[in-house]
Regions:
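Short alpha-helical oligomerization interface
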Residues: 108-125
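Helix N-cap/beta-alpha junction loops of NAD(P)-dependent oxidoreductase domains
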Residues: 107-109, 152-153
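Conserved Rossmann-fold NAD(P)-dependent oxidoreductase catalytic core, especially the SDR/UDP-sugar
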Residues: 127-171
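Conserved NAD(P)H cofactor-binding loop of Rossmann-fold oxidoreductase domains
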Residues: 103-106, 145-146
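N-terminal Rossmann/SDR dinucleotide-binding element
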Residues: 1-98
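N-terminal Rossmann-like NAD(P) cofactor-binding module of classical short-chain dehydrogenase/reductase
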Residues: 97-100, 142
């Protein structure tokens, strides 16, 4: 909890999110779940947490169960977001001001056995969210990823073709 409180109290322009609807996909994952907790700790943001694992969400977000600012819905990003509102009790056409896309099948086993399906799901999922956001007045979109997308490589600083990719190369 100390890290969550520390992040929530960071000197950021939080006022831009005050009263806004923020969608966090991958909310039952490590990064998405932490982002949900930081946003909820702020106390003035409407958080819509979306994930595939409803049981995990009930345990992880139990303290927010009766909080009117917290909403969880089961969602697989490979489906258009508009399908969710038609097939569930969620309000249709929620205007998400900000979308934080932290959902992906991060399982190495899934990528090893069905890499094309995993890649397609990531591409279509991102496209689905961007299209929904554009149609509903989204202000900003944040895509969360990992260095794993670059693969193992094998290059070093001394590789004849040039230096290896470093985190500092990307800011």
């Amino acid at each position: 909890w100390d890290d969550i409180k520390l992040a929530a109290n960071e000197a950021l322009p939080w006022e831009k999110l005050r009263g806004c609807n923020v969608l966090v996909t991958g909310a039952t994952g490590l990064i998405g779940g932490c982002l949900v907790e930081v946003l909820m700790a702020r106390g003035d943001i409407n958080v819509y947490a979306a994930g595939r694992n409803e049981a995990r969400a009930k345990v992880r977000f139990a303290e927010y169960k009766d909080n009117p600012r917290f909403h969880f819905f089961k969602y697989d990003v490979s489906r258009p977001l508009s399908d969710v509102s038609r097939s569930s009790s969620e309000e249709p056409s929620i205007p998400f001001h900000y979308i934080i896309h932290a959902a992906s099948d991060a399982s190495p086993a899934a990528f090893a056995s069905t890499p094309v399906d995993v890649i397609k799901s990531n591409i279509y999922g991102t496209a689905n969210l961007i299209e929904y956001g554009i149609a509903h007045g989204m202000r900003r979109f944040l895509y969360v990823s990992t260095g794993e997308v670059y693969g193992e490589g094998g290059a070093t600083e001394d590789t004849p073709d040039g230096p290896a990719f470093k985190e500092s190369d990307n800011g």
